[in-house]
């Protein structure tokens, strides 16, 4: 009970801070004219933390996780992944997650570990079968026991589906051996 009350207070505080940062500010020198918002986006929160393993992104210097897809959208509605909006960006463990709606951003704030993809969004089969980092495609996914798993392509997904429990077991051992700053290289 205390934990859920704390989370509710935390979410409210983050939303209030984000709203205050994105609201137009008045400058007394401009006699009430509005100035640019402090925050670059309309909704932003930094949940802090450091990645415990590598997170897939298109370029090593990029911080956008899951190619900008809304990770909560996999679990809601039709279960179809939706592209997130820059307006609803949450930084989690050093990476930026985007959301299609404020409700989805709030859900992520409540429990980011529930929605963040397994193995940092890297291909679940590659990590399980070969202890290798390969890109995960946000359109090729499966939710197993409440966790989101991405795979490289549909062919690889088929191989992964042949022994999901076995590949997850191996990947759970292999993934932590990779450094958080590792990145897939072509």
Identify what each model region corresponds to.
Residues 1-10:
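Bacterial N-terminal signal peptides that target proteins for export
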Residues 86-124:
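Mid-length scaffold segments of soluble, non-membrane domains
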Residues 161-186:
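C-terminal partner/receptor-binding element of secreted or periplasmic proteins
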Residues 22-24:
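Bacterial signal peptide processing site
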């Amino acid at each position: 009970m205390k934990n859920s009350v704390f989370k509710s207070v935390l979410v409210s505080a983050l939303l209030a801070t984000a709203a205050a940062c994105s609201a137009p500010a008045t400058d007394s020198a401009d006699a009430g004219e509005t100035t640019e918002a402090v925050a670059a986006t309309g909704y932003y929160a930094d949940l802090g933390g450091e990645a415990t393993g590598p997170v897939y992104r298109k370029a090593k210097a990029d911080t956008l996780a899951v190619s900008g897809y809304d990770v909560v959208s996999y679990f809601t509605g039709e279960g179809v992944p939706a592209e997130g909006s820059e307006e609803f960006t949450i930084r989690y463990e050093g990476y930026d997650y985007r959301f299609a709606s404020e409700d989805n951003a709030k859900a992520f704030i409540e429990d980011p570990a529930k929605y963040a993809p397994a193995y940092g969004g890297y291909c679940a089969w590659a990590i399980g079968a070969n202890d290798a980092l390969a890109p995960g495609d946000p359109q090729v996914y499966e939710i197993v026991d409440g966790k989101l798993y991405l795979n490289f392509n549909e062919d690889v997904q088929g191989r992964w589906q042949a022994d999901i429990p076995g590949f997850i077991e191996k990947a759970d051992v292999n993934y932590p051996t990779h450094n958080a700053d590792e990145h897939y290289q072509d």
